[in-house]
């Protein structure tokens, strides 16, 4: 069986996108894990599915990590989906509904931007496994600043790029 998909890249992340408006497919964790595998599948960081809504220029997007779990908003993935939908429907603005909330997207001079909203800094909103100061999280020799923009992020400030080589992620 042929299953149509779109493969897109955004700032170092790659995505497999299924347009469930035009070609609905059933996707479960097992399917997502299989197609996300870089050796045995297509390979990606996340799988995104576009769902229809009753509101014009609104689209629902479900986002899944490569382990099959549903996740909150991803800015790079949202921009990729918005770019695809804007080209498909000749739009310059649209709204994407995610489990993290509504994400307004615009296109100006062929550049797609998304308003991810305000960052969340409370350890429970990120979420971290235990209560701690999110503005000073120790990662071996580095200090991180933790926040959520729909999914968890850790920001590490460095004096110079040479320090990047010492960072073992």
Feature map (PLM): residue ranges:
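ATP-dependent small-molecule kinase catalytic core of the GHMP/sugar-kinase superfamily
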Residues: 90, 97-158, 162-166
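A glycine-rich beta-to-alpha transition motif near the start of alpha/beta enzyme domains, typified by
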Residues: 1-110, 155-169
């Amino acid at each position: 069986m042929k299953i149509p998909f779109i493969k897109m890249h955004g700032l170092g992340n790659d995505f497999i996108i299924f347009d469930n408006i035009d070609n609905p497919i059933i996707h479960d964790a097992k399917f997502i894990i299989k197609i996300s595998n870089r050796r045995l599948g297509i390979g990606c960081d996340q799988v995104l599915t576009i769902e229809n809504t009753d509101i014009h220029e609104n689209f629902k997007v479900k986002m899944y990590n490569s382990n099959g779990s549903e996740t909150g908003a991803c800015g790079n993935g949202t921009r990729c989906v918005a770019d695809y939908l804007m080209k498909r429907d000749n739009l310059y603005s649209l709204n994407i509904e995610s489990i993290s909330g509504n994400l307004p997207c615009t296109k100006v001079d062929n550049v797609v931007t998304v308003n991810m909203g305000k960052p969340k800094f409370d350890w429970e909103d990120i979420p971290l496994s235990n209560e701690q100061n999110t503005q000073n999280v120790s990662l071996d020799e580095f200090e991180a600043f933790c926040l959520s923009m729909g999914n968890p992020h850790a920001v590490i400030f460095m004096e110079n790029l040479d320090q990047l080589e010492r960072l073992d992620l």
